[in-house]
C-alpha cells in the first residue's frame, strides 16, 4: 500500500488519488463537470424551481381515510375489506394539480410529500408525534447532521416530525388516533407479540437488534417493495381487469376456503380498480374546474389533461401523452396501496416507444415536447418521499429507490431495440438532476455504441447515474434463480432493476419484501470479544471461544454470522406470515402477471415466479481487510501478538471515540494525546497491510471465501414462499448507521466510523493500484448466484474528458463486464468541489452524488456519508 495514506486521510481529510503523484488535486480551484444540463423549457425550469424550494411535509389524509374505511368495513372478508378500504381512500383524497404540469396525480398534496402506512408500523411515528423520550437517544445516535432548509418548515401551523419532515398541527391529533388504533393491529406489533411465544430464536433476534447486527426500531416501516410491476396491464385498461375478475367469479364454484379466498380476492381487485378509476375522474373534474378559471394557453392544457384522465387508467391509451399518464397513474396507485419502496418503472422507454413513434410520425408530438415530458416525470417521481425512523433517515434521507432503466434486449427476440426515447430519458437525466428516479444502463454485448455513449454522457454530468449493469449476466442469473420454476428465456430477458441495484423480473417476479441489512463489522467485533458486544455489554451467543489462532477468528466469525443470518431469515418468514393476514397487496397484485388469473395476491404465491427473496449486507470489505491484517501481522509475520493487536483495537488505535464528540466521519478523526503514541505504529502497519481492490490474491482470496460462505448460508434457508433465499450484496447506505454502532475493526477503521459501502467497493483510500486492479479484484467472485453486487468508483472529470474519454470509459465498462463484472456506478466529480459544497452549501442546492444504490442531494446527506464519498479514491486516469 501507499505508505500511511489512510492515516493521512484520517488526520487531514485528504482524498486519495490515483495515480498517487497526480497534480490534479494540487491547484487552488477545482475542475468542474464536463457535461452540464438545464431544463429544456421554461415550464420545466419553473417546475424544478418549485421543487427545489419545496419543504418536506407529511400528509395524513390517506391513512386517516383508509383507517376510517377499514373500521367501517369490519367483518368483511380480508381481501374484500382491503379493496373497499383502498377504494374509499382514493375516492376521498384531494386532487391537487400543480402549476405547469401536464402529467398529474400524486400520493400527497405537497411538492415534497410523504404519508405513513400505519398498517405496518406505528411506534416510531407515535414517538415522533409525541416527542417521546424513547426516540431521543436513537435520534441523537442516528442524527442527520446535513439537514438543510428543505427539511425545515418555518410556516405557522406546522410542527416537526422526525428529523426530515413537518406536519400540520391540526393533523397530529387525528393521526395519533389512527396510530393508536393500529398499534395493536400493525404488522410490527402483531408479529412481535406472536413471536414472543412462537419463535424459538426471538431473544436472539432482540439481542441482535440491540447490539446493531440488524436495523433497530421501525424495521417494519420499510419492509415492502422492491419490484417492477407489470405496467403493460394499465396499457390494456383497468376495465379489462374488472371484466376478467367478474368472469372468474361467474365461473367459479366455491368448494373450499382456498377457492372462496380466490373469489374474495377478485372482488377486492374489482373494488380497487373502481377506486382507481374514480380517483382519476376526480382529477379530471378538478382539471375542468381549474380550466373554467384559467386563461389560455393553460386552459387548453387543463382540458386536454381532463380528457386523458377520463380515458386512462380505465381504457387503453390512444397516444403518447395518454400512455405516459397511464403509466404514472399506475405508479401512484401502487405506492399509495402500501409502503412500497423501490417500486421501479423498469424499461418504460420500451413500453412508451410505440406510442412515441406513432405520434412523432403523425405530427402529434415533437422530440422536444417528449423531452419536456421526460423532464416532468423526473419531478413527479421526486415529489414522492417517505418517512422512516431515525436509523433509516440516517441511511437514505427520504429516498424511495425507484429505478428507471434503458438498454437491454428485446425479451422475445434477444435483439437490440435501443430507441430514441431512451436517448431522451438519458438527456432528461442530464437536464433535470433529481434523486428520483435513479437511472440504470443495461449494457449487453449487443447494445449499440450510440446508446452506450449517450449513457456515458449522462454519467459525466456527475449526478451519479446511470449505474451500469451487465445485462447478459442478469439474464444468466434469472435462468439460474428461477430454474426450479421453469422460467422461459423471454421472461428471463424481461428484467431491469427493482430498487437500487437488485436484478428484478418485470411484471412476473415476487417483490423482495423486507429491509434487512446485516452488519458484518459488528460480527467481526463480536467474534473477537467472545460473543460480547463492547458497546452494550450484551452477550449475543455462547460458545465463542477465546482467540488463539487465525482459524479461531475465522470460525468465530462464520459461527456468529451463520447463526444470526438464520435468525433474521426465519424471523422475517414469520413477519410476512402476519403481513399476509393484515395488509395483503391488492393493487400491487393487479399489476403483477398471473395474480388475477391465479386468484392470489403477490404476497401469497400469486406471481409467476416467487423465488426472489434476498438478504442484504454491509461492511464486508472491512472484515476482509481486517482478517488479512490479522493473518499477516500476527500469524505470518509475527510482528504483534493477538493480545497487542486487540488492545490497540479496543483503544480505538489511539483516537478519541467518535461517540464522545458526535463525530462519526472517517475524515478528521481526533487523536487522543494520551494513547496515540502507544498505538500509532500498529495502526500504521495495519493500514499498510494488503487491502482488497489492488489485485492481491492474499486478501482477495479471503474476500471470495467470505462471500462464498455468506452465499452458502442464504441458499440453505427457505423463504416464506418455499424457495431458497438469495444473496443480495448491497448496502444502500446502511454502512453509515451500522458503522455508528460498531467499534474499531481490525482493518484499522475507527469506532463509529462509516463502514465500507458495498460488496466490491474498496475501503476509501486503499485501492492504490488503480481502477484496473480494483475490477480485477472484484471479478474473482462469481456473482451469478447473487441478485446484486455493488461497486462504487470515483473519477476526476479530467480522467474521461472529451469524446475520446467517453469511448475509453465505455470500453473500460465493457471490458469489466466481459471479465465477469455485474455492476458499477460512478461519481464523476472533483473532491475539491465536494469540500467546497460542504463549506458553501448555499451554492450547491442541486448538487447530487451517488451514495450507494441511489443518488441524493449533497446538502441532504449527513456529514459522515458526505465524508465517506469524499474519501473514496479519486482516479485521475483510466
Curated annotation (Swiss-Prot):
Keywords: Lyase, Organic radical, Repeat, Transferase. One of its GO terms (molecular function) is lyase activity. The modification Glycine radical is found at residue 853. It comes from the Bacteria. GO terms for cellular component: cytosol. Disulfide bonds: none annotated. This is Indoleacetate decarboxylase. It comes from Tractidigestivibacter scatoligenes.
